[in-house]
Design a protein with these regions (language model features):
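Primary recognition of N-terminal secretory signal peptides and signal-anchoring hydrophobic helices
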Residues: 2-211, 238-253, 573-576
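Catalytic domains of carbohydrate-active enzymes, especially glycoside hydrolases
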Residues: 266-293, 345-358, 537-549
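A short macromolecule-binding patch
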Residues: 219-230
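Glycan-binding loop/region signatures in secreted carbohydrate-active enzymes
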Residues: 240, 468-538, 568-580
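Substrate-binding cleft of extracellular glycoside hydrolase catalytic domains
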Residues: 310-358, 362-363
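Hydrophobic faces of well-ordered beta-strands that scaffold small-molecule active sites
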Residues: 258-262, 281-285, 316-320, 358-360, ...
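Substrate-binding surface in catalytic domains of secreted glycosidases
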Residues: 293, 300, 369-374, 378-496
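Active-site groove signature of glycoside hydrolases
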Residues: 343-372, 419-434, 551
Length: 580
């Protein structure tokens, strides 16, 4: 082969390699340029795909409003995003809504509604039903909820804004670049756009990203704009027709509260006179009991009891019990009508007997009925406050027991009533097969710490037992048999004295403890005492946990020293050693 031919082949190969390399570099640089400087999208997409779309907290919701002579908002939207406590009562075909001062009932498709059982008239229905869906009139909603509802006629969209919400105002700057005038669906020029804006268009800033603002126009359309074309112009604050501030009901009673329950189960058992109970401020007689599922209430109250109590300076918060009957309770709580029947009776009794408050004692309730019990409290409290009554409710510590603990919606109940009274006893029930304290101090503290995670300390009253249990443990051929009986303080002292026994302090429970072995028999008695030692510690928990006070169960079990001890300890805070 000639040298010239070889040289030409090498030259052609080199030229091809150079051309290929240049082409590759051009393609690579073009791709890189496109990545760094992408072509803006010219695709326009609709922001609203349906009429009456809801806008709330920057988000769009599929639940649509309805226009029927005026704007209506879906009930389901209000319940999920504005007021979780609003209820629909199927039997009366009404929506029930409560505030701290009012109870509203809105019958479906009616020009009348009820506020605290007083009929109100409107020129439009507050509640409408359409195709199986419920809707509430926006005009009425703005009179009871702290919010502003805006309707944009040109886009047929609805925006809900909350009272005191701050809106960052802005305007569109002038720009010749068409692509920068377009609001994008995401913070990039390659995304589709929903609208093209002109200079001076007023905007509200909803989100600040790295290079973009998410903005919303005055007709509800939202999208992303480059920060360079947005001029910030100060802020607006939403001022709703109704303010968000809750007006608390303040009972005219000094801190710390000391309530004592007065166990009365027959009308004939009402005392004819009231003793002097040192430090006690409130008596709570067990007078009212749910009689049946229709909501009738058994009443054994006494006007002379209240009159004498008032003369002694006591307030009277009468107790209303569900009789611990779950089926009866379920039926009575199931409808607005039956709940109102109970409420009307209680308010009538409160007026007749000149009561100062009501104490709700619902126990042994099906777990699924817990929300209905909460609703009952919500519906009772505003009407009770209107009558000048304090509302308290008894609860247990948090546990896994469905019918004695889990049905209590403690956080919601704390918001519905004035005080929650935690029954801090029955650590060991009377039927327990393990002998133990009614309420050991470490058990109380541990459970208080847990409960105070969901209940405000200044709304919580600590239940204090004034009774003890005498435990009898018998060893027999068939094993161990455990039984108990309740003792008053005086009965416990008498039992010890008859056997010449002295108690010893039990550090593990924070109580005095006594044990007795029956001679020549396989019988042992054990008793964890409620006396000056334990009561002083319990009263100091009010200071330690900054609680509202105590409620003692019950007046019948106490001796004179108990009242004196509790009063002294509630009046003075002590420095508690860690070992205690």
């Amino acid at each position: 082969m000639a040298r010239t031919e070889v040289y030409n082949k090498k030259k052609n190969r080199t030229t091809s390699l150079i051309v290929f390399s240049l082409a590759f570099l051009f393609i690579l640089s073009s791709i890189g340029f496109w990545v760094v400087y992408p072509f803006p999208s010219d695709e326009k997409v609709p922001y609203f795909t349906e009429d009456y779309t809801m806008i709330f907290e920057e988000d769009i919701f599929n639940k649509q409003a309805m226009f029927s002579n005026q704007l209506y908002i879906p009930y389901t939207f209000i319940k999920q995003h504005i007021d979780s406590s609003i209820q629909f009562d199927e039997e009366s075909s009404s929506v029930i809504m409560t505030t701290d001062q009012k109870v509203y009932q809105m019958p479906s498709d009616s020009l009348n509604y009820y506020m605290n059982n007083s009929k109100q008239k409107l020129s439009f229905p507050v509640l409408k039903q359409e195709n199986g869906n419920l809707y509430l009139a926006s005009e009425w909603l703005q009179k009871v909820y702290p919010m502003e509802i805006r309707y944009f006629k040109d886009t047929k969209a609805v925006q809900i804004l909350e009272h005191d919400q701050i809106l960052q105002k802005a305007t569109m700057r002038a720009t010749e670049d068409e692509d920068l005038r377009r609001m994008r669906t995401s913070p990039t020029l390659t995304s589709p756009y929903v609208a093209e804006l002109s200079e001076g268009v007023e905007l509200f800033i909803e989100k600040d990203t790295k290079e973009y603002f998410k903005v919303r126009t005055e007709n509800g359309v939202a999208g992303y704009l480059k920060k360079s074309v947005v001029q910030l112009n100060g802020t607006d604050r939403i001022k709703a027709e109704v303010q968000a501030n809750k007006i608390p009901f303040k009972p005219s009673i000094e801190w710390p509260v000391h309530v004592t329950w007065d166990g009365i189960y027959q009308a004939s058992a009402n005392p004819t006179s009231q003793p002097d109970l040192e430090g006690v401020k409130v008596l709570s007689p067990t007078w009212f009991e749910l009689q049946n599922g229709e909501g009738d209430i058994r009443n054994i109250a006494s006007k002379s009891y209240v009159d004498q109590a008032h003369e002694k300076g006591y307030r009277v918060w009468a107790l209303f019990s569900n009789a611990f009957e779950p089926d009866r309770t379920q039926k009575a709580l199931s409808t607005y009508e039956s709940r109102q029947k109970m409420i009307k009776q209680l308010l009538q009794y409160a007026e007749i007997y000149n009561l100062d408050g009501l104490n709700l004692d619902f126990e042994n309730v099906y777990e699924q009925d817990g929300p209905k019990l909460t609703q009952f409290a919500r519906e009772l409290t505003p009407l009770a406050h209107e009558a000048g009554l304090v509302v308290s409710m008894d609860i247990t510590f948090i546990s896994e027991s469905a019918m004695w603990s889990k049905f209590y919606e403690r956080e919601e109940l704390a918001d519905a009533v004035d005080y929650l009274m935690v029954m801090a006893y029955d650590e060991h029930w009377g039927s327990s097969q393990v002998a133990g304290s009614v309420s050991s101090l470490p058990w109380v503290k541990r459970n208080l710490n847990q409960l105070l995670q969901v209940v405000p300390h200044d709304r919580l009253i600590l239940g204090v037992p004034l009774y003890t249990r005498l435990w009898k443990i018998e060893q027999g051929e068939n094993g161990k048999k455990v039984s108990s009986e309740s003792f008053t303080m005086e009965e416990a002292e008498k039992w010890m004295k008859e056997r010449d026994l002295e108690s010893k302090y039990d550090r593990s429970t924070g109580q005095d403890y006594v044990e007795y072995q029956v001679p020549d028999k396989s019988i042992t008695y054990k008793m964890w005492l409620e006396n000056k030692t334990s009561l002083a510690k319990r009263a100091q928990l009010v200071h330690q946990f900054q609680l509202a006070g105590i409620a003692t169960w019950s007046k019948y079990f106490a001796d004179d020293e108990a009242w004196k001890t509790l009063d002294e300890e509630l009046s003075h805070r002590k420095i508690v050693q860690k070992s205690e």
